[in-house]
Amino acid sequence: MAYLQPADYPNYGLPTGTTADWITSATALINSYCRRPDLNVIQYTERLRLTSGVQTVRLSYLPLAPLGTGSTPLVSIEGRYGRPRRGEILNEPLMEIAWAFSLPGQWTALDPNSVDYDPNTGELTLPWNVMGLPYNEVSVMYTAGLATVGDDVKSACAQIVRNAQSTPALNASKTKIDTMQMQYFSSSLVDETVQAWLRPYVANRLG
């Protein structure tokens, strides 16, 4: 979905005659820069390794937000006990018990309501197992994005269009602007101002 609608053009300094292809291409460029398929709320799945002795992980896509009428952005979570790597065993007798019951390698469903999360940082704090065993890997299905596209994203979209329209190689073309053309000039179109507006939405890692 495009981040600017025709009714928005006057408010963000774009001529009313701006065609949809400019907005569509600018929207695609924003998604590419933020390393995510969309800034609207959609579902993601990540598999993450936990640091030894720590029961927290950080998700890539922010902000965490429920989809539609959902009450939580956490759809499902599974934790797994794996054989620790060298230097990771904190309680060797406890791990020996776990191995005796064949726990390593098994995925266990966690109640999403038992997991604390920060919607702005994407940090999850996992509960401990009843035996006191830490998980060392989790698979998280969650939703993240903007329920309402804000002024920062709309301003970024408009600025990219203005930058593109002032780029001679793009503006001189009489054909429709497409995403590939915009990507070629992305280093100049996504200027420092645009980067500042989009910084909160850039994925923490490549997805």
For each predicted feature, which ranges?
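Divalent metal-cofactor coordination and adjacent catalytic microenvironments
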Residues: 1-207
